[in-house]
Amino acid sequence: SDQAAQLVQFLSTFFRKNLKRPSEIVTLADEIEHVNAYLQIEKARFQSRLQVSLSVPDDLAYQHLPAFTLQPIVENAIKHGTSQLLGSGEIMISASRFNRHLVLDIEDNAGLYEASASGGLGMSLVDKRLRAHFGDDCGITVACEPDRYTRITLRLPLEENAC
């Protein structure tokens, strides 16, 4: 079927990105392609129970960031957030500029984040990698309104001439 063929294509993209990333640093466009393949696989699993929106302005597509920055955060949002909902889950990913930073927001509509769990190992590792690579001005912050949303915000330096 067409759906099975599409799923195989997304699996192929996801595994290729996992195995053959050319370097530790990738473009935001490449990272979004990787996370979108992952999201399409999850959408096949959850079907109409998972809605996804991506909002990345073209002028930010060539900003650089460490590979595998978004996928662990998105995986947490599904595993600890939307998959726990009885109704439909939503994952929203957006990129914007704020002052001299690239700001990436990953938000779910579950609002189930527990500070004691610290978001798990994946989120902690991403935060440590961002801070080690870019300094303590960068990293992850979490905002949660119980039963409404959890928003993970990643701050990275903005490259003025990325293209």
Language-model features: locations:
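Two-component histidine phosphotransfer core
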Residues: 1-143, 149-155
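Generic C-terminal helix-cap and adjacent flexible tail
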Residues: 157-163
